[in-house]
Amino acid sequence: MPKVSVRKSIVIDAPLEKVYEFVRNFKEWPAWSPWLITDPECKVSYADDGGQYTWEGDVVVAGEMSILSEEKPNEIVYQLTFLKPFKSQAGVAMNFALKGGGIEVAWSMDSKLPFFLFFMRPMMTAIIGMDYERGLRMLKELLETGSAGSKLEFPGEEAMPAQDYVGLRSAASIAEMGEAMEYDMKKLHDWVAANEVELAGTPFTIYHQWNPTKATTEYTLGFPLGKPLDSLPDGFVAGERPACRAFPIKHTGSYCHLGNAWSSGINRARNKVFRQSKTIAPFEIYENSSA
């Protein structure tokens, strides 16, 4: 059977014992779990001895996590069982070690896919890896500041009007996307300010391509226009974001946690909470700042 192995890590500025005990306590997981944050209505229950928790929801479906063994304060070994959409198991571990004045938390998983899903191995490895990275970032912020720094709201479907825009189309690795976006934002802002361009709202980004396996994306950062422009400098693009029915997901928090909103949307589309358009690219709107 095709094997799937994932390992991601992060360094947290907190005492080793505090980090270990926090992670070991399943009742703390809803605050930093990369899956539970996407499904606020998910039902979670805990074993009396603290060694297991179970969940069931419309988005994250159903499963359970049990502690198999632990070596305090350096390692916790779990068994992860998915009950739906089909039953499967995975071995999971959390390892804790001193590193550079902080604590390195390494989150790993080893599992096997059914043979008929062998072609999904690269995709599953990439997606689970990104999930682990999202969770570790929230865990770090939670332990260092007291808040995970990410909140999701689901206001329901709404009509989005068509919008003219001026923008920059770019390609970047997901790891370098923050820097690329910051560069594009400054370039657009400086040009708009220098030319006294009339804007009609806050910036947004349209995602034309997103490749989890290669960890790359192609996007257009756009500034909404009050009226179309007659001419543009080299490298700039103009277009119209088409009118559509949208399923908005509101994220409040740092840009580094925005993947929580995207994961929530992808999972809802997969579970038929809404029907995703095949012709209109998904987009994100920055209501205040993209920082």
Feature locations, PLM:
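Hydrophobic ligand-binding cavity/cleft-lining segments
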Residues: M1-Y46, E158-P161, A180-K187
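A solvent-exposed interaction/effector surface
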Residues: V60, Q79-T81, F86-A291
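Glycine-rich portal/gate segments that line the openings of hydrophobic small-molecule binding cavities
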Residues: D13, R24-W32, T38-F86, K99, ...
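Short, surface-exposed charged micro-motifs
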Residues: S9, E64-S66, A93-N95
